[in-house]
Amino acid sequence: MEPEIKIVNVVVSTQIGTDIDLEYAADILDNAEYEPEQFPGLVCRLSDPKVALLIFRSGKLNCTGAKSKEDAEIAIKKIIKELKEAGMEIIDNPVVSVQNMVATTELGMEPNLDDISTLECTEYEPEQFPGLVYRLSDPKVVVLIFGSGKVVITGLKVIEDAYIAFDKISATLKELEQELY
């Protein structure tokens, strides 16, 4: 049975121009904050889709908090439209690339994290963090496994890798269970 894997965050980046006047952009964009003494970029929060966009003077733009690449692209198009309408020189259809996706799912059981921590590529220090950190090399992702059975997969570039990672972890846990019990 396929696990129900849900994307909870997508981070993308793109280049919308060069030498962006962030003071001017902050004045024309709704919900924009620019405090260069705090952070070198302009922060703009949208409610639909619910994302945060970080725009830097260099023209680099990061979008975080999206639930899909498509949502991030919609948000970026909205910002580009506003900036262009205000007379700024902005790239029309910039190439958007996924930097990271975070997905969640459930194991469907309460794992023994102490047992799993005997495996290679795992870290488990419950005094520091309640989840077990499992680093996979193919796909190159980090899987956090919690005692409740909740799983968080981060470092994804494509959703398919979440399913591959989950299948690998599930198979490894089944093998471990057979060895131990």
From Swiss-Prot:
GO molecular function: DNA binding; DNA-binding transcription factor activity
Database matches in InterPro entries: TBP (IPR000814), TBP_archaea (IPR033711), TBP_CS (IPR030491), TBP_dom_sf (IPR012295)
PROSITE patterns given in the database record: TFIID
Pfam families: TBP
GO terms, biological process: DNA-templated transcription initiation
Transmembrane regions: none
Sequence repeat intervals: 7-83, 98-173
Keywords: DNA-binding, Repeat, Transcription, Transcription regulation
Domain of life: Archaea
Keyword Repeat: yes
Keyword check for Transcription: yes
UniProt record similarity statement: Belongs to the TBP family.
Function: General factor that plays a role in the activation of archaeal genes transcribed by RNA polymerase. Binds specifically to the TATA box promoter element which lies close to the position of transcription initiation.
Protein name: TATA-box-binding protein
Record organism: Methanococcus vannielii (strain ATCC 35089 / DSM 1224 / JCM 13029 / OCM 148 / SB)
Organismal lineage: Archaea, Methanobacteriati, Methanobacteriota, Methanomada group, Methanococci
Chain's gene name: tbp
